[in-house]
Design a protein with these regions (language model features):
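Catalytic-domain carbohydrate-binding cleft regions of carbohydrate-active enzymes
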Residues: 1-229
Length: 229
């Protein structure tokens, strides 16, 4: 099977450190040497990320102390949720200093030899929060993913160049076609989900998106032989 990109999903970081963007030293004691081996074989490297910051990390403490995470509407500090992992906070991409803080950390990942990012999530955005620039949380629910992917894509353009910058993004809104490529999220391995995926791709094409992808044979459960074929 032809292969051009090798992807590291969430466990390139230590479990429940999603996301502090630190390689798990137990699994990758010399990540630069590891990624060089892949590059020497002509492969590009993709790493999984999201905009949620685990409360048990130094990165969370730094973000909370500097006001880089979305705040509670009642003024009692960082808004947190257990949707993905316990007590995570969300980066406030309306704060230019928070964008720089977040992308500077991603820059260290690129420096290790990573070429692009899978920008997961971005759609589970609360409406009972306060943004740095005073944005309406209801309006920001869909726009958040635009700012998230814009920040990451802009970094990739700066570091990798206009013709090499690419994402593998999960969530989107109007205008997100400027930050390709998107995929259809976590579809199930059954015929109804396959039909939904095809309809989603056609909708994307009609909405100005030139590129899209999906999970081969579905993500949830295992496809039957007939479905896989």
């Amino acid at each position: 099977i032809p292969l051009s990109v090798f992807h590291f999903d969430c466990f390139w970081m230590h479990e429940f450190h999603w996301c502090d963007f630190e390689w798990d030293k137990k699994c990758f004691p010399d990540i630069r040497a590891t990624l060089k081996k892949y590059h020497d074989k002509g492969l590009h490297i993709c790493a999984w990320i999201n905009p949620y910051i685990a409360q048990g990390t130094a990165f969370f403490k730094e973000g909370a102390a500097n006001g880089y995470l979305l705040q509670r509407a009642d003024g009692k500090g960082v808004w947190q949720t257990d949707n993905w992992q316990a007590g995570m906070g969300l980066v406030d991409f309306t704060n230019p200093d928070a964008v720089k803080w977040y992308t500077d950390k991603l820059r260290t990942v690129l420096d290790c030899g990573v070429d692009c990012f899978k920008t997961d999530f971005g759609e589970r955005i609360p409406v009972d929060v306060v943004y740095h620039d005073g944005s309406d949380p209801q309006a920001m629910h869909n726009y958040y993913t635009y700012l998230y992917n814009q920040a990451v894509f802009s970094l990739l353009k700066e570091v990798k160049g206009e013709n090499e910058a690419v994402l593998f993004a999960r969530s989107a809104t109007a205008g997100s076609q400027k930050f390709p490529v998107h995929w259809g999220g976590d579809c199930s391995a059954n015929y109804p989900s396959m039909a939904e995926t095809l309809r989603g791709g056609l909708s994307f094409a009609m909405s100005g998106f030139s590129f899209w992808s999906h999970d081969i044979s579905g993500l949830e459960s295992t496809a039957t032989p007939d479905l896989y074929k």
